[in-house]
């Protein structure tokens, strides 16, 4: 039998057309029409149902970060600036593929590698490289096989694996999240059904770190709470604790028997040094604490679309690390089966090849340096233009690709509606999407929005 269609015949859903059992039942008049149509070898049947089974599903709100880019693309103004999404751009505001990434991809082509499935835990060479990059190759935790590393779908997917582990094996545990934090953190823990609350972090009065509030809230949390920490370049504020403050944070977490859960999305990209940006994580591991760490290579290698990252669990014994790894694999299997290979090979080749590794560090320093230059230029432009006496030095004290401007929602809306500057509504701007040439324009927009919009 074949499926034949008659464009002219459309069967509308009404009281004469009934669905019953496995067949459609027609009135006598409709049956004759149907028979005539069938005899002409051209049948078209479209059952238009008035009410969808999905009618009760509400429309989801646009993503607060990715939605910024959608609005930016719809704007036809020549002056428009996209400072919403954290993706590195050149001085010409073009996407940048690292030269070292191109070299690694050429090596892969020369080897003629296949596209077979990876193991559930990912590419072994990547997992080894990423743990060593995070902790240092000579770290006792690695040598003692106390690190369970599973390749995840970039930072988001790796955090999600960690959240699922908490939900499954730490019933009743809560996660403490900084106020503010990256927009997706709360979604991830909500989706994993892990309860969370916030600890104080940003002080709007000083546009700096509320360190006393942070310590008080971590102390007040029930024993055994998971504390989500940004390893470096805090998103969205760009405000990091000092080394001395990290020591105090570690003291309190250790005293309260909490479990630190680090999100390391910018290793090497914040300061330009891979080791400096991993110092906070290494401090906690050196203290003998058991630690969870999610990693991402979206920013520091520009592998945004490759979705390459890892979840690392540093345990107190090799036996517990092995059990944790087995359960992370068990969680990953029904979620996505196994991770993508392309980005994993890029990372493994670059970290494992001394020449490529050195080249990567040079490129990373270049990218971090460009952002530092833009940060300085923006501060200089605002300081020279604004005669109000306001102290804008917080811009220089922040680190990484973001600056937390202190602008409220109305002021951020003015930035977009009047100045065509697209940013998140919490006042965060991505300096990675700014050029030196655009700093004067952005300074005018910030000054106008800050002083003339409440």
UniProtKB/Swiss-Prot annotation:
- Do the record's keywords include Transferase? yes
Which InterPro entries does the entry mention? Aminotransferase_I/II_large, Asp_trans, NHTrfase_class1_PyrdxlP-BS, PyrdxlP-dep_Trfase, PyrdxlP-dep_Trfase_major, PyrdxlP-dep_Trfase_small
PROSITE patterns, from UniProt?
AA_TRANSFER_CLASS_1
| Cofactor entry | pyridoxal 5'-phosphate
The protein's matches in SUPFAM superfamilies, at most eight in alphabetical order, are given as:
PLP-dependent transferases (SSF53383)
Q: What is its EC number?
A: 2.6.1.1
EC primary class? transferase
List ligand-binding residues for L-aspartate.
86, 182, 235, 428
Q: Where in the cell is it found?
A: Mitochondrion matrix
First-listed, main subcellular location of the protein, grouped into a coarse class: mitochondrion
Q: Name one GO cellular component term.
A: mitochondrion
Q: Which reaction does this chain catalyze?
A: L-aspartate + 2-oxoglutarate = oxaloacetate + L-glutamate
Q: Which residues carry this modification: N6-(pyridoxal phosphate)lysine?
A: 299
The alphabetized list of GO BP terms reads: 2-oxoglutarate metabolic process; aspartate metabolic process; biosynthetic process; glutamate metabolic process
Keyword terms of this UniProt record: Aminotransferase, Mitochondrion, Pyridoxal phosphate, Transferase, Transit peptide
* Domain of life, per lineage: Eukaryota
Molecular function terms from GO: L-aspartate:2-oxoglutarate aminotransferase activity; pyridoxal phosphate binding
What is said about its interaction partners and assembly? Homodimer.
Function text: Important for the metabolism of amino acids and Krebs-cycle related organic acids. In plants, it is involved in nitrogen metabolism and in aspects of carbon and energy metabolism.
Q: Which PANTHER family match?
A: ASPARTATE AMINOTRANSFERASE, ASPARTATE AMINOTRANSFERASE, CYTOPLASMIC
Q: What NCBIfam families does the record point to?
A: PRK09257.1
Q: Which family is it part of? A: Belongs to the class-I pyridoxal-phosphate-dependent aminotransferase family.
**What is the name attached to this protein's record?**
Aspartate aminotransferase P2, mitochondrial
Organism of derivation: Lupinus angustifolius (Narrow-leaved blue lupine)
